[in-house]
Structure formats: structure tokens, C-alpha cells
């Protein structure tokens, strides 16, 4: 049996970029190691959730790990909160949130200039309203998670986040009668937090420095903790997660995986790429399954920066050299969780390239790992197929039937 390393480059898929004379960032990147893996791979295209579906990183990671989003997904908030180490109990409602910059009632920047440290702000806006305790914890850059703890709460509420700039933050609405209390308390929380943020020393200092204040919390993705089957019970694989992204850590934590903490694991473009794959090489000796998430490709896509996306891919390509000589003992899977084309600055419904690489498998005659070359491979799959194929190629699957 072989151990499995699943590398997910978040938002990997792209469209042709004029900056690269019609190539995608992946095609334009210098990627000798990824191409070498491709020559020892079964490869093709994957729809993370389904054809044409613009999946989020939450639903796509669930799908790739073999958990149907239709069954297990009820909101992103719980995963974000768990990934930040927050405790959630039955009846709690969790949200993901952005610190944003609002002026004259309009959202001018949903990321408040990609503010790097919001811990003081999160402590300041954690509060109690009526019989509900509201805890805010900062994530990477502008991101945060919010947990509501108290009686009679519901996740059936709308977002305050308009999901685009030059729009007003929205009033939270109950989506059914049982959610009226939750919506009322959330709207009061948003009002009070706005007053606190506008007067907070962190934001006053930022304005004096000519920076955007983080003076609004945009809330979205309400949910309660789903009952996710333990990964080991499901696949009999001892699993570990390497990621600087709270969402991914939260999904993997809920699935019972070990979360690996490392120095300089940022979840940003300035990632510790070399350290990640050194750690993966070390962990592959004692874990059956390792998932690695690289967030920088997605960040660059959202920022419409194909040059940075190419650079992230090249950094990954260089660092992956630490494990590509272990193909006698490893099955290495490389893919994205969705496409984030730089010309769109958002997720698209396009499929992503995927390859399953190891020695002694029926490799396809594909020389390059990119969105178009892998069309000549043998695979056209969905995310829910990945673990089944991985178990088969690693000689871990069980026979179906007599």
C-alpha cells in the first residue's frame, strides 16, 4: 500500500491572460517538477462539485474529501470558526466575516486594504446582547469568524455582506420565524460594533497613516456544526492537514484529522512553501494521508494578479521537489479546488486540472500539467470521485461485490 499526498492549489484554474499572450498562469509558469509528475500520472479534468457549478472552497473541499455537500454543508461559518480553534456546541451559530471599509454608508473595500492584524478589533467587538454571547476571533488578514452562543438561536438568517463593493451593508433578515431572535441580535451587534470600530485606536492610527480603517464587519455563511463522519472511520486512513487557511483546517478538524502547526504557515501569498513540503516528506512516514492546501493561487486570482499567481505556482513547483522522488511509496495528487480566473477576480464554474502520480500506474501520454493539456488524459471526473480513485491507486480499496 502507498500513502497519499493530496495537494490542492486553491483557485488553480484560470483563463487565458493577455499578459501571458493568451496563456493561463499555470501554462506561463516555469513548472518542471509538476510536468515531470504529469508524465507519471493518470490525469484529466475535474468538476469539484459538478459541471458548471461555481463552488466555494468549503463545498469543493468537502466534495474532494468524499463528503457530499448536499448532505453535509449548511454554511461556511462553522468551518471557519473551528479552523481558528474556537469551540462550538450544539445550538451555536457561526459565521464567517470580513473587516471592511465603509464610507458614507457604502462598502468601498470588502477587505479594508487587506489589513494584516485585527486581533485588537476582534477583542473589542466581542460582547453579550440579551442572553447571547458573541465571540469574534481574527483569521488571516481581513478575515474573522463569529460564534453566537445562547438559547433559541437559528442559522436561517441572511448575510449582511453585499458581496460586492459600492453597495450598502444589508440588514440581516430572518429566513423563518424561528430566526427572528438571531436576526435581531445580529443587527444590534453590527450597530454596536460599528460604533466601537469607528472610535478604536487601531483605526484612528490607520487613518492617520493614510490607510483604510476596518470600520465594518460584514457577516455571511451562517451555519451550525454538521455531523461529519470521521475520516479514519470512513477510509481507514490516519490523516493530517497542512494549511494556513482556517476554513480548510476547520473542515479537516471536524473530520478528525491531525492539524499540523508550523512556523510561517500564513495562508497568504508569502507562504512557507519549502517548509510545507519538508514537513509533508517527514509526515508521510507516519500518516497514510496528508492534505496540503496552498491559498496563494486563489488570493492572486481574486486580486486579478496573474503575475503573482504564476509566482505562487513556481514556488510550489520548486518546493514539491522534496517529495517527487518518493513515488515508489507515495501517490501524489495535484489539483485545484475550483477555478479563480484572474480576469474575473472570482470563482468560476470551469473544471480544474488533476493528476494522480505514482510509479507503476497506467500513466497517460500527457507531457504538461495545465488546464488544456490534461484534456488529453483519461479522466473526466467530479470531486466525489477523487478519494475512490486515490484508494484504488494506492492499493487500499476494497472489492465491490463477490
From Swiss-Prot:
Reactions that this protein is recorded to catalyse: (2R)-2-phosphoglycerate = (2R)-3-phosphoglycerate
Pathway: Carbohydrate degradation; glycolysis; pyruvate from D-glyceraldehyde 3-phosphate: step 3/5
Gene3D superfamilies on file: Alkaline Phosphatase, subunit A
Signal peptide: none
Bias-annotated ranges (Basic and acidic residues): 160-174
InterPro entries per record: Alkaline_phosphatase_core_sf (IPR017850), ApgAM_prokaryotes (IPR023665), Metalloenzyme (IPR006124), Pglycerate_mutase_ApgM (IPR004456)
EC number: 5.4.2.12
Keyword tags: Glycolysis, Isomerase
Pfam family, one: PhosphMutase
Region (Disordered): 155-174
Gene Ontology molecular function, alphabetical: metal ion binding; phosphoglycerate mutase activity
SUPFAM superfamilies registered for this protein in UniProt: Alkaline phosphatase-like
Gene Ontology terms describing biological process: glycolytic process
UniProt keyword annotation of Isomerase present: yes
Sequence similarity: Belongs to the BPG-independent phosphoglycerate mutase family. A-PGAM subfamily.
Stated role: Catalyzes the interconversion of 2-phosphoglycerate and 3-phosphoglycerate.
NCBIfam families, A to Z: apgM, PRK04024.1
Protein name stated in the entry: 2,3-bisphosphoglycerate-independent phosphoglycerate mutase
Amino acid at each position: 500500500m502507498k500513502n497519499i499526498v493530496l495537494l490542492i492549489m486553491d483557485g488553480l484554474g484560470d483563463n487565458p491572460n493577455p499578459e501571458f499572450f493568451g496563456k493561463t498562469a499555470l501554462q506561463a509558469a516555469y513548472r518542471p517538477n509538476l510536468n515531470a509528475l504529469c508524465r507519471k500520472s493518470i490525469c484529466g479534468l475535474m468538476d469539484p462539485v459538478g459541471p458548471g457549478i461555481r463552488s466555494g472552497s468549503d463545498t469543493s473541499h468537502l466534495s474532494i474529501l468524499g463528503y457530499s455537500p448536499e448532505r453535509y454543508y449548511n454554511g461556511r461559518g462553522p468551518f471557519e470558526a473551528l479552523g481558528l480553534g474556537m469551540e462550538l456546541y450544539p445550538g451555536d451559530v457561526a459565521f464567517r466575516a470580513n473587516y471592511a471599509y465603509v464610507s458614507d454608508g457604502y462598502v468601498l473595500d470588502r477587505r479594508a486594504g487587506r489589513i494584516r492584524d485585527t486581533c485588537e478589533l476582534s477583542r473589542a467587538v466581542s460582547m453579550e446582547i440579551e442572553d447571547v454571547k458573541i465571540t469574534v476571533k481574527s483569521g488571516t488578514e481581513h478575515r474573522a469568524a463569529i460564534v453566537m452562543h445562547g438559547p433559541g438561536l437559528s442559522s436561517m438568517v441572511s448575510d449582511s455582506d453585499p458581496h460586492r463593493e459600492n453597495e450598502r451593508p444589508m440588514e440581516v433578515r430572518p429566513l423563518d420565524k424561528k430566526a427572528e431572535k438571531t436576526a435581531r441580535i445580529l443587527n444590534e451587534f453590527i450597530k454596536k460594533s460599528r460604533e466601537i470600530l469607528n472610535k478604536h485606536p487601531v483605526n484612528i492610527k490607520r487613518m492617520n497613516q493614510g490607510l483604510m480603517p476596518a470600520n465594518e464587519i460584514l457577516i455571511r455563511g451562517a451555519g451550525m456544526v454538521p455531523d461529519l463522519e470521521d475520516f479514519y472511520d470512513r477510509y481507514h486512513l490516519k490523516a493530517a492537514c497542512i494549511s494556513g487557511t482556517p476554513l480548510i483546517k476547520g473542515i479537516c478538524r471536524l473530520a478528525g484529522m491531525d492539524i499540523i502547526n508550523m512556523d510561517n504557515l500564513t495562508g497568504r501569498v508569502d507562504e512557507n512553501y519549502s517548509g510545507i513540503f519538508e514537513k509533508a516528506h517527514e509526515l508521510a512516514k507516519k500518516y497514510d494521508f496528508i492534505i496540503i492546501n496552498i491559498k496563494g493561487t486563489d488570493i492572486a486570482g481574486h486580486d486579478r494578479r496573474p503575475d503573482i499567481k504564476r509566482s505562487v505556482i513556481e514556488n510550489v513547483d520548486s518546493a514539491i521537489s522534496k517529495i517527487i522522488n518518493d513515488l515508489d511509496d507515495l501517490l501524489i495528487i495535484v489539483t485545484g479546488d475550483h477555478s479563480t480566473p484572474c480576469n474575473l477576480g472570482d470563482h468560476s464554474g470551469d473544471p480544474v486540472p488533476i493528476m494522480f502520480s505514482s510509479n507503476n500506474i497506467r500513466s497517460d501520454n500527457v507531457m504538461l500539467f495545465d488546464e488544456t493539456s490534461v484534456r488529453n488524459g483519461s479522466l473526466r471526473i467530479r470531486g466525489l470521485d477523487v478519494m475512490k480513485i486515490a484508494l484504488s491507486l494506492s492499493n487500499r480499496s476494497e472489492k465491490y461485490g463477490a
